[in-house]
Amino acid sequence: MLVEDDHSISEMVDHYLTKEGFGIVHAFDGEEGIRLFQQGSYDLVLLDIMLPKLNGMDFLKIIREKSNIPVLMISAKDGDVDKALGLGFGADDYIAKPFSMIELTARVKAAIRRATQYSAEEPAVNKVIRIHQLAIDIDNVSVLKNGEPLQLTSTEWQLLCLFASNPKKVFTKEQIYRSVWNEEYFDDQNIINVHMRRLREKIEDDPSSPQYIKTLWGIGYKLGEF
């Protein structure tokens, strides 16, 4: 789904992604986007921030109440504050206008690939990683804390699995980005910081003093020890 009020951009994105094999459903304002989202089933949402009737941030908050669908925000705003807001509300990635269609396509494919890995069932013996109050069920793609399910986005799930599967390893931000986003790292620390903060808000008792994922200042992150 593409939610974009600029018809020229919408047509350009549609033309390019259709050639790449994607089917596109268009919405030209936030309210139409919500209506279409509730009526259909989609692999990803491309979402502009500045929309009529309902802006992109409010759109994102509404769909995040019930869905973990990958969301890639596209906007003319390129400030760190706007990027942090979008990611903070639950976007998986962010790209600023004007953007390269090659880069946009790569980000779309990467987001869908992460979501597919998140939802795929593996024909293996059920593997559950237990860390203090967390039970991370790899095959059923679920996380429980004290027996209660946690709702993670695909990116948050990939981050948690990365640390849980490598309990002794210290990860630099470059290593995290390459592992989770499967792309070259261009020193965009903000995107990792925001996703890490959102994950901690869900798994930690006190996100300001994290125990599950520790920060090693100037180095990176590692799984906490209990």
UniProtKB/Swiss-Prot annotation:
UniProt DNA-binding region: 126-225
Sites of 4-aspartylphosphate modification: D48
PROSITE patterns listed in its UniProt record: OMPR_PHOB, RESPONSE_REGULATORY
One GO location term (cellular component): protein-DNA complex
GO biological process per UniProt: regulation of DNA-templated transcription
CDD domains to which the protein is assigned, alphabetical: REC_OmpR, trans_reg_C
PTM description: Phosphorylated by YcbM.
Localization per record: Cytoplasm
Any one GO molecular-function label of the UniProt entry: transcription cis-regulatory region binding
Classification via InterPro entries: CheY-like_superfamily, OmpR/PhoB-type_DNA-bd, Sig_transdc_resp-reg_C-effctor, Sig_transdc_resp-reg_receiver, WalR-like, WH-like_DNA-bd_sf
Sequence ranges assigned to domain Response regulatory in this UniProt record: 1-112
Record key words, sorted: Cytoplasm, DNA-binding, Phosphoprotein, Transcription, Transcription regulation, Two-component regulatory system
First-listed, main subcellular location of the protein, grouped into a coarse class: cytoplasm
Pfam families linked to this entry: Response_reg (PF00072), Trans_reg_C (PF00486)
Role noted for this protein: Member of the two-component regulatory system YcbM/YcbL.
UniProt cross-references to PANTHER family, sorted A to Z: REGULATOR OF RPOS, STAGE 0 SPORULATION PROTEIN A HOMOLOG
Protein name listed in UniProt: Uncharacterized transcriptional regulatory protein YcbL
Organism for this UniProt entry: Bacillus subtilis (strain 168)
Gene: ycbL
